[in-house]
């Protein structure tokens, strides 16, 4: 095994898995099975180890097997520092428990231990969904490159909740405006760090998105993310104060910035075809991987790449182009329902009703 690979995972009461122990190899790991058997659940569990949660839900309850109170994911990660043991306990009634090598850890510790990128049917929301999907895409990249930024985002969220609570209290009774000014100033300071981080990222990200789009589509095109944010947040809050007090909510800041994606200068969300939208979404994910590969300080050398039932949504040309990009990575995990796919695999696994079996095939 080489750097940053998952060699083993144990699942207990995760989704439809009661208990399952699964080993992986480097190269291409193919996971076959009919719909509803647990392929996506397995992909989700692997991605969960990267510190960015589930790509399907923000809630813990759906992750826990029906009738149980807790789910567990544990894994062995092969890194340049040797084998790292990662554990995540997922609970209905309390915060998740995170451990690295047996020691209590934070999310940023997971980000530094295991890097993983997942391609899934939900990726179409990067193009067709609301701006929140694209904001999260940018913010996840920022936190991957600089795990300490997780603290900035957490502080921003806490400050936002405090400010919203204060705004609501204005509606019920007269509160001191200087207290609102204090929370506003704190929100502006944290928000500015996020806005500037996004601007720096877009400068290096957009050329990559255009390059990958042109490669996947087979035609020269310009694709770019465009972020509309306030140039002076403190002035914006002054203008919005009366309205914010009336509505009891913060109406400006990076959590509300409009992030749009343009294809040849046209808004892709409303004007791109299904094929163009998928190509854009894939280009965004491939650009993320390229950035991670360039950040040798953290990712040495490749992230683990998961393709969860993505090929089923692509035509043969785009499928071939995507395969050329990702099958050369150190470790790729592909789920599929198609038994006719003839990939050169290091390992083929079959999933049936929450049980995983090895076909012991070598490509």
From Swiss-Prot:
Listed Pfam families: SMC_N
Keywords: ATP-binding, Cytoplasm, DNA damage, DNA repair, DNA replication, DNA-binding, Nucleotide-binding, SOS response
Keyword DNA repair appears in the UniProt entry: yes
BP GO annotations: DNA replication; DNA synthesis involved in DNA repair; double-strand break repair; SOS response
InterPro entries (alphabetical): DNA-binding_RecF (IPR001238), DNA-binding_RecF_CS (IPR018078), P-loop_NTPase (IPR027417), RecF/RecN/SMC_N (IPR003395), RecF_2 (IPR042174)
Chief place where the protein resides: cytoplasm
Matching Gene3D superfamilies: P-loop containing nucleotide triphosphate hydrolases, RecF/RecN/SMC, N-terminal domain
An annotated Gene Ontology molecular function: ATP binding
Function: The RecF protein is involved in DNA metabolism; it is required for DNA replication and normal SOS inducibility. RecF binds preferentially to single-stranded, linear DNA. It also seems to bind ATP.
Protein name: DNA replication and repair protein RecF
Gene label: recF
């Amino acid at each position: 095994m080489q750097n940053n690979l998952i060699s083993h995972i144990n699942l207990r009461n995760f989704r439809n898995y009661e208990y399952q122990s699964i080993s992986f190899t480097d190269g291409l790991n193919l996971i076959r099975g009919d719909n509803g058997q647990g392929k996506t659940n397995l992909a989700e569990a692997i991605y969960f180890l990267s510190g960015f949660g589930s790509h399907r839900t923000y809630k813990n309850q759906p992750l826990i097997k029906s009738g149980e109170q807790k789910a567990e994911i544990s894994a062995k990660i092969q890194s340049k520092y040797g084998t790292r043991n990662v554990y995540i306990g997922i609970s209905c009634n309390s915060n998740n428990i995170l451990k690295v090598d047996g020691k209590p850890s934070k999310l940023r510790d997971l980000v530094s231990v295991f890097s993983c990128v997942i391609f899934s049917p939900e990726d179409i929301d990067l193009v067709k969904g609301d701006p929140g999907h694209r904001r999260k895409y940018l913010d996840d990249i920022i936190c991957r490159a600089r795990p300490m930024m997780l603290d900035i985002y957490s502080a921003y969220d806490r400050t936002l909740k405090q400010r919203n609570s204060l705004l609501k209290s204005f509606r019920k009774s007269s509160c001191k405006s200087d207290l609102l000014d204090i929370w506003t100033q704190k929100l502006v300071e944290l928000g500015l760090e996020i806005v500037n981080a996004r601007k720096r990222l877009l400068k290096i990200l957009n050329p990559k998105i255009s390059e990958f789009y042109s490669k996947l589509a087979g035609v020269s095109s310009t694709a770019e993310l465009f972020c509309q944010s306030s140039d002076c947040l403190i002035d914006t809050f002054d203008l919005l104060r009366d309205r914010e007090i009336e509505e009891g909510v913060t109406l400006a800041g990076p959590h509300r910035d409009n992030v749009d994606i343009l294809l040849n200068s046209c808004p892709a969300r409303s004007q791109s075809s299904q094929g163009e939208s998928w190509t854009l979404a894939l280009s965004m994910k491939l650009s993320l991987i390229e950035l991670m590969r360039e950040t040798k300080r953290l990712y040495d050398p490749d992230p683990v790449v998961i393709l969860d039932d993505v090929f089923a949504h692509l035509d043969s040309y785009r499928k071939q182009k995507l395969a050329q990009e990702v099958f050369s990575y150190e470790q790729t995990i592909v789920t599929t329902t198609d038994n006719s796919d003839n990939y050169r695999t290091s390992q083929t696994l079959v999933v049936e009703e929450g049980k995983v079996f090895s076909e012991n095939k070598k490509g």
